[in-house]
């Protein structure tokens, strides 16, 4: 047997499986030939121990609380970079030079307008429709307007589609918000940066001048960076799976948005904010801590723990700082929700129960407070998540298209239904 392979014994028969090495993190065992050698599949619900692809975009070390994009720590990117710089990094693999950054920013900014006919899509929805429902429909419909960039075999068309989606998502998200609250749409302005443009499209009204607060714009930009990509999560895997069939990029991103809408994925910050509201005051925290520890109580602390992180989510530290900056800039000194959040965090980092179960604050814990302070209703939280994550989805989709090992996704199953049986005519049943 090759020293780079592993031997698996199944019912007295051996199977030789190839070991594949990672740059950092766990190596993987290639099981593609397992069925051929043993006539057996592996069983791993939720992909707990299964790598579905090879990727060079994002790395997470959940035990150490590390998040890297193309090798760069998220802390450094959020502190020193801006969102479009991170977009360039995710798409192309390297940080841009000054000239590359200027050119990339220009190309994104000049794709922010959407076809005027798109406005008719919004009028077809009820005003009280959830903005995520609207986003699913409108993003999927982009392929009907921009069918000159849907040939996935053409690298140029793929890149044009990538830029279009990164550029148009803020416009569509702002339109969804404006339609939801009954205000007129606001067109983008090419002389504003990405985050400032988005805030203006959301909060400007025709009857008065709107000046973007640079502190709030920087906070919005940082929130986008923190949500740009997060490895092979549910929505990213959905985008890859849809893309493996050859679906156009707009359809793939719409599929990702639909998956992100699930409360276990993109809706966590909304649930965390609702939990803080339910607790109400700091003096009620012990009551809810006791409930969280009670196995028979359905109450769960939202914003704590993570499927991957078994340490402090590095994004949570940055989000906490951002929350303080936003509240300070807006003069919100005695926000009860922030007081509750800070005390809950203190308890979680010192209480043996939370430490033993590795329940540390995650990025959703502070993001809800921050977005609420910026003026967004809870129904928009997941929309903002989708807006930011679009670049990650696109980068992962492009990588999947270019990977020669990838083919259409076709998971196997453990069948537990009825064995072969004969059809019985209706008259004899």
Swiss-Prot record:
Pfam name, any one: Citrate_synt
CDD domains listed in its UniProt record: EcCS_like
Catalysed reactions, as listed in the record: oxaloacetate + acetyl-CoA + H2O = citrate + CoA + H(+)
GO biological process per UniProt: tricarboxylic acid cycle
Pathway annotation from the record: Carbohydrate metabolism; tricarboxylic acid cycle; isocitrate from oxaloacetate: step 1/2
GO molecular function terms listed in the Swiss-Prot or TrEMBL record: citrate (Si)-synthase activity
Residues annotated as signal peptide: none
Domain of life of the source: Bacteria
Catalytic site: 306, 364
Gene Ontology CC: one annotated term: cytoplasm
PROSITE patterns (UniProt xref): CITRATE_SYNTHASE
Record's keyword terms, sorted: Plasmid, Transferase, Tricarboxylic acid cycle
InterPro entries: Citrate_synth-like_lrg_a-sub, Citrate_synth-like_sm_a-sub, Citrate_synthase, Citrate_synthase_AS, Citrate_synthase_bac-typ, Citrate_synthase_sf, Citrate_synthase_typ-I
EC number: 2.3.3.16
Enzyme class, first EC level, given as a word: transferase
Similarity remark: Belongs to the citrate synthase family.
Job of this protein: The exact function of the plasmid-encoded citrate synthase is not clear, it could help nodulation by allowing the bacteria to use citrate as a chelator of iron and calcium.
Protein's name in the database: Citrate synthase, plasmid
Originating organism: Rhizobium tropici
């Amino acid at each position: 047997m090759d020293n780079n392979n592993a031997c698996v014994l199944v019912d007295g028969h051996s199977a030789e499986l190839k070991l594949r090495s990672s740059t950092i993190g766990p190596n993987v065992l290639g099981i593609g030939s397992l069925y051929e050698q043993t006539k057996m599949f592996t069983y791993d619900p939720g992909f707990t121990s299964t790598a579905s692809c090879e990727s060079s975009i994002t790395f997470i070390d959940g035990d150490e609380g590390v998040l890297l994009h193309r090798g760069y720590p998220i802390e450094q990117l959020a502190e020193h970079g801006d969102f479009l710089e991170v977009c360039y990094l995710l798409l192309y693999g390297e940080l841009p030079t000054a000239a590359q950054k200027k050119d990339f920013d220009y190309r994104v900014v000049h794709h922010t307008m959407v076809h005027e006919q798109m406005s008719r899509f919004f009028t077809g929805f009820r005003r009280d429709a959830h903005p995520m429902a609207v986003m699913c429909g409108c993003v999927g419909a982009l392929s009907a307007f921009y069918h000159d960039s849907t040939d996935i075999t053409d690298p140029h068309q793929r890149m044009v589609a990538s830029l279009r989606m990164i550029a148009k998502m803020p416009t569509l998200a702002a339109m969804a918000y404006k339609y939801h609250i009954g205000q007129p749409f606001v067109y983008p302005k090419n002389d504003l940066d990405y985050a400032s443009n988005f805030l203006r499209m959301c909060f400007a009204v025709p009857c008065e001048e709107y000046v973007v607060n640079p502190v709030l714009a920087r906070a919005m930009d940082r929130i986008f960076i923190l949500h740009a990509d997060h490895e092979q999560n549910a929505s990213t895997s959905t985008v890859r799976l849809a893309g493996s069939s050859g679906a156009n990029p707009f359809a793939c991103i719409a599929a990702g948005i639909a998956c992100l809408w699930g409360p276990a994925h993109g809706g966590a910050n909304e649930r965390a904010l609702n939990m803080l509201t339910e607790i109400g005051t700091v003096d009620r925290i012990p009551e809810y801590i006791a409930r969280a520890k009670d196995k028979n109580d359905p109450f769960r602390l939202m914003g704590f723990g993570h499927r991957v992180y078994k340490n402090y989510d590095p994004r949570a530290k940055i989000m906490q700082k951002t929350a303080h900056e936003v509240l300070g800039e807006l003069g919100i000194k005695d926000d009860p929700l922030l007081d509750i959040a800070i005390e809950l965090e203190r308890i979680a980092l010192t209480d043996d129960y939370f430490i033993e179960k590795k329940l540390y604050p995650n990025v959703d814990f502070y993001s809800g407070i921050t977005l609420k302070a910026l003026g967004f209703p809870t129904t928009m939280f997941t929309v903002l998540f989708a807006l930011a994550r679009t670049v990650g989805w696109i980068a992962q989709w492009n990588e999947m298209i270019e990977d020669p090992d990838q083919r259409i996704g076709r998971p196997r199953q453990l069948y537990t239904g009825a064995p072969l049986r004969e059809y019985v005519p209706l008259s004899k049943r």
